Amino acid sequence: MEEPRVGTPAWLADEPLTIGGHVFTSRLFVGTGKYRDVEETRDCLAISGTQCVTVAVRRVDLTGQGPSLLDALDREKHVILPNTAGCYDAASAIRTAVLARDVLGTSLVKLEVLGDPKTLLPDPVGTLEATRELVAQGFDVLVYTSDDPRLGVRLAELGARAVMPAGSPIGSGQGVLNPFAIRILLELVTVPVVVDAGVGTASDVAIAMELGAAGVLLNTGIAAARDPRRMAAAMRDACSAGRQAFLAGRIPRKLYANASSPLEGLIHAAGRPGTP
């Protein structure tokens, strides 16, 4: 028997997801890096059905002086979620978030404070420091973190609007390596938990959603696929299927078989073992 959840988070209900005043009917968050060209970017975003698109602030032209990835985004259809990818300390992440707010006019920010360029794992101390400061400055912080449940709790207590634990290292395609940690985090916080990073294929998305995650953020899983457009459709469908399965409730795992057909009124063939 499953233990009861602590509280009843609104995002567990069969309702649209709300983060920072934005309402999302799609629970798939999609990044804009690594696509072959602008046309492929547009197509994949449209096919995925995403309503929230992440943009690496340090890797796009925000000046308006030349071609920019932002030109490919439909601001009527997509909420732009600027992220601080490429920042390795709290100070640079804070500066990047402030720049994004000034240029894009949004208080939303996906906070990333990375530990090193090889693993791209989040730095916990810098992440806590930057979260505290950005919340104090009025940002709606969606924070990328490890799958450590206690760290996720601390970030939620600091005022993060959503906690985004890594399923596995960024771009690794390893999927959700520690589903038990994600489940524990879901038990401990009432803000949305969005699994972020490491998604390699549609089944990874389905698993994250079946665990009870409020959403999944991915980029490489679509952009680096052999057929990105087809994979965008697969990720979209997996997100929906996983959410529906979670809401429906899976049957418990059992050691022994349990016949699905009723035994009452069973007709036994005469002469067979076990029959009258």
Task: Provide a role label for each language-model segment.
Residues 1-15:
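Basic/polar N-terminal segments that are highly enriched at the extreme N-terminus
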